[in-house]
Amino acid sequence: MKNQKYIRNFSIIAHIDHGKSTLADRLIEHCGGLQAREMRTQVLDSMDIEKERGITIKAQTVRLVYKAKDGNTYYLNLMDTPGHVDFAYEVSRSLAACEGSLLVVDSTQGVEAQTLANVYQAIEHDHEIVPVLNKIDLPASEPEQVKQQIEDIIGIDASEAVLISAKSGIGIDLVLEAIVNKLHPPKESSTDILKALLVDSWYDPYLGVVILVRIIDGTLRKNMRIKMMATNSVYTVENVGFFTPKKHISDVLYAGEIGFVTASIKQVADCKVGDTITDEKKPCEQALPGFKPNLPVVFCGLYPTDSSEFEHLKDSLAKLRLNDASFEYEMESSSALGVGFRCGFLGLLHLEIIQERLSREFDLDLITTAPSVVYKIHMRYGESLEIHNPADLPDLQKIESMEEPWIKATIMVPDEFLGAVLSLCTEKRGVQLDHSYIANRAKIVYKLPLNEIVYDFYDRLKSCSKGYASFEWQIDVYEPSELVKLGILVNGEVIDALSTIVHRSRAEQRGKVLCVRLKDLIPRQQIDIAIQASIGSRIIARETIKALRKDVLSKCYGGDISRKRKLLEKQKAGKKRMRQYGNIEIPQSAFIAALKIGDE
């Protein structure tokens, strides 16, 4: 298939729950990609978590063959991209593989913050955008208002927006005609030298790593020797083909096409999303622009509740890493929790997904330490460090300054909840950058410290707006900040698993809350237990769990007072010995509950 004018490469942009995967299902069904008996909901979402949460995590592609009204047969390559902000880099690479996008907006809800972020990325990639209004068969649908919203917020003409209901199949043929008539075909190949974009990759137990590619120039054939330009590794192509969504093997992929390649690659870490693939014998001179390594943003410790499960956890993480190169981990040990792993994630959703997959697919029961971010530390003697584990923070006397990451957040919220959202952002040390109104919704842009977001910001935003606010963010800058290490001591011993790095203005409040929480959770012992929060050597909060007292005089009825005194002195000496050598056992439930702390 060398004639590029009959190829259309497109992606679908939508907020969570606006009907992206349902529309993809209908397009596959309409073009006969699957028989009716093989159809199921969310065909392209392969993981159970993707189906349950209604989100797309890995990019998927499918080739549809469509006989248009003009009598020609078109080959439509649909790229189903992740919609969540944690996977923004995957989205940008998927968009780079396409020439156009369908912007799917729920006609009962209007434009949301995440839609905005992805649309702006598509516009940066010079995409032709076709607005599609979904759920028009619902009574609450307001297509005219939503069209106006699209024009006001995004600034693209929505007068010819396609009105559909993906669930009931209304208007699907109109979407296909719009793809054929409004989206551009791929640019003509300027050279015969292979240049292909690596869009995504995943691990197959039989084939090794399967790579999703978009051919920009040249052709990709079976048995070719290919080179990855970012890692300089070389492989021999075993199979090339495409998905319909079933796997189809073909001998060659031409310029403009999207397909898959297998080449006995052992791990996904060798295939970096956004890399350029070229011919080893005749390499292209310049790699495709936009490649950057995916760096973790949020870190936390994962520990097995039962130490005998450590090897199982180690194997499970290695298996997950096969399929998810953006997830990093290294071994660490804690005096309170034993041996575990320090893991790095792209964001909070990514962290939740990995946790959920570990408990579901590998049946692991885990303790997760408080999430932290990467801080930049400038020492007095000139050295600079990057740390993400509070336990690694050097002595404050040796530190010249500390920097923390700030994000730029866009929040869309209905008018009536604006006050609550603004006060939440202010409480989280936010700085307002922009504030505008579109119909009865407000769009606010805030600069916020990432440290404040990773705790409970998203949950609190949803609860203070009754679920109506939508939120999107990207890392902005690192700025100097007055940060301190908040340590928790139980009977004078530091519990490293509960240490966190916080802003000085929040330390006292968070320390008090943690001490009160632990007081309720740690069981009483035979001696008093002191729970303290400290900054360096200064104690900023304290709670005491009173001792249980055994009544040693219960068997003494009357008689000599010296007998009673002797028993009491014996008890006193025993308690003194316990205080000296006694170890306070902190139950796992106390750790789990204390680590769920927000800023109550």
Curated annotation (Swiss-Prot):
It catalyses: GTP + H2O = GDP + phosphate + H(+). PROSITE patterns: G_TR_1, G_TR_2. One of its GO terms (molecular function) is translation elongation factor activity. Its main location: membrane. GO terms for biological process: positive regulation of translation. It is a peripheral membrane protein. Keywords: Cell inner membrane, Cell membrane, GTP-binding, Hydrolase, Membrane, Nucleotide-binding, Protein biosynthesis. It comes from the Bacteria. InterPro entries: EF-4, EFG_III/V, EFG_V-like, EFTu-like_2, G_TR_CS, LepA_C_sf, LepA_CTD, LepA_IV. Its EC number is 3.6.5.n1. GO terms for cellular component: plasma membrane. SUPFAM superfamilies: EF-G C-terminal domain-like, P-loop containing nucleoside triphosphate hydrolases. Required for accurate and efficient protein synthesis under certain stress conditions. May act as a fidelity factor of the translation reaction, by catalyzing a one-codon backward translocation of tRNAs on improperly translocated ribosomes. Back-translocation proceeds from a post-translocation (POST) complex to a pre-translocation (PRE) complex, thus giving elongation factor G a second chance to translocate the tRNAs correctly. Binds to ribosomes in a GTP-dependent manner. Belongs to the TRAFAC class translation factor GTPase superfamily. Classic translation factor GTPase family. LepA subfamily. This is Elongation factor 4. It comes from Rickettsia akari (strain Hartford). The gene is lepA.
